[in-house]
Amino acid sequence: MGARCSKFSFCLFPSHFKSASVLESPDIENGGKVWPTFKEFKLEQLKSATGGFSSDNIVSEHGEKAPNVVYRGRLDDGRLIAVKRFNRLAWADHRQFLDEAKAVGSLRSDRLANLIGCCFEGEERLLVAEFMPHETLAKHLFHWENNPMKWAMRLRVALCLAQALEYCSNKGRALYHDLNAYRVLFDKDGNPRLSCFGLMKNSRDGKSYSTNLAFTPPEYLRTGRVTPESVVFSFGTVLLDLMSGKHIPPSHALDLIRGKNCAMLMDSALEGHFSNEDGTELVRLATRCLQYEARERPNVKSLVTSLVTLQKESDVASYVLMGIPHETEAEEESPLSLTPFGDACLRVDLTAIQEILSKIGYKDDEGIANELSFQMWTNQMQESLNSKKQGDLAFRSKDFTTAVDCYTQFIDGGTMVSPTVHARRCLSYLMNDNAQEALTDALQAQVVSPDWPTALYLQAACLFKLGMEADAQQALKDGTTLEAKKSNKR
């Protein structure tokens, strides 16, 4: 759940929802925080949100080769989402899938990347969760670029993970499938969250562990069943990751511990940054979790109690410990190098946007509109073209109400697809103070033409109008990145 992009979607809510707004529910356990209610998404919504399940939006390990792929996306209200798409052999019975998803979707905690919805249409089975923008624990431990994760942050990760498991256990969801460093994510504030995806199997009768068998609980190898004690064993392997900065097989780690070679187990990058007492206690906890006999392992409640006493620098924000930019810091970054169109969208200069769109015409539609038009020249197609021409005349003469009507007739005709028409109707909606409809068109322009920076810049203008400045800035940044990629290919 990681790489940056700006993929939004259209929320076409089914009739049984009260309105197109996000339904929310308070959570007393989390300080009365308001959470989005679990919902069923349409497949078309999730296609739009992920750019048609574009490979550019894959954020899961092993990319497209994984049996179940996770995509980054964005809903039309600006929220980032993670979408897990199961392979077509998983969850043949959609009712079982829905029941399981609803059960997991009822959980709400600051320690989880919460499940906010699902989708089942035909053979498709998808889960939708909150998106965590700052990568996985595996990335920060095993593939760090600038600085290793600090000791205090590693202890915080261990505690938050234990608290997440305790919360799930208290809610009747004690089983977690394939717990590992890739399941621990970091939110916008750098706080660790446990992915909700592991609370469901990869299929109704599928495997609960996909990692190397060397990291699998011994009882699972014997019985094929996951128990709460199996989860504690896997938690112990994550403790090893945190201590060593490497993915060490439990058997090897235990050999080092029994041989009193604990120093060889610890990450050399942490030398001098923790006390012997703290290191010894964490090794002790890991050893207890990794006991061969399941009954000899601690429960998650006792793990939380032990880890609370080890915490350091508790008053320091996670994003500071992680060394990652925060929202307030992001505002101070160097300004983007914008094209004239991008700059006009930054300033929400609608007149300038209209002039540039009029000037570039339909050159960006090359290879799109005709390629998607399979019908012969019929009366219906001629009517659509006439509607587009009338819309263009109204657009140039700044009669934006007429432009919206004519472009709508062209789009509804369905005989041709044009990102430029969506861009022009987007601007026409903005001129008529209808930013939400404008954003929908900007999103659709990107769905039709995923590599078109203009769509991203227009999304930024719409988001600025809607008061969503942080998301608008991100859309500008993504548009600039896409513009640079296109320039490099020329």
From Swiss-Prot:
**Where are the Phosphoserine modifications?**
S25, S373
Principal localization?
membrane
Q: Which residues form the Protein kinase domain?
A: 56-310
Matching entries from InterPro entries are given as:
BSK, Kinase-like_dom_sf, Prot_kinase_dom, Ser-Thr/Tyr_kinase_cat_dom, TPR-like_helical_dom_sf
Name the Gene3D superfamilies for this protein.
Phosphorylase Kinase, domain 1 (3.30.200.20), Tetratricopeptide repeat domain (1.25.40.10), Transferase(Phosphotransferase) domain 1 (1.10.510.10)
A GO term from the CC aspect: plasma membrane
Q: Which Pfam families match?
A: PK_Tyr_Ser-Thr
What processes does the entry annotate via GO biological process terms? brassinosteroid mediated signaling pathway
| Lipid modification (N-myristoyl glycine), residues | G2
Binding site residues for ATP? H62, G63, E64, K65, A66, P67, N68, V69, V70, K84
Give its E.C. classification number: 2.7.11.1
MF-aspect GO terms: ATP binding; protein serine kinase activity; protein serine/threonine kinase activity
Catalyzed chemical reaction(s) = L-seryl-[protein] + ATP = O-phospho-L-seryl-[protein] + ADP + H(+); L-threonyl-[protein] + ATP = O-phospho-L-threonyl-[protein] + ADP + H(+)
State whether it acts alone or in a complex, and with which partners, per the record: Interacts with BRI1, ASK7/BIN2, ASK9/BIL2, BSK1, BSK5, BSK8 and BSK11.
- What does the UniProt record say this protein does? Probable serine/threonine kinase that acts as a positive regulator of brassinosteroid (BR) signaling downstream of the receptor kinase BRI1. Functions redundantly with BSK3, BSK4, BSK7 and BSK8.
What's the name of the protein?
Answer: Serine/threonine-protein kinase BSK6
The gene name on file is BSK6
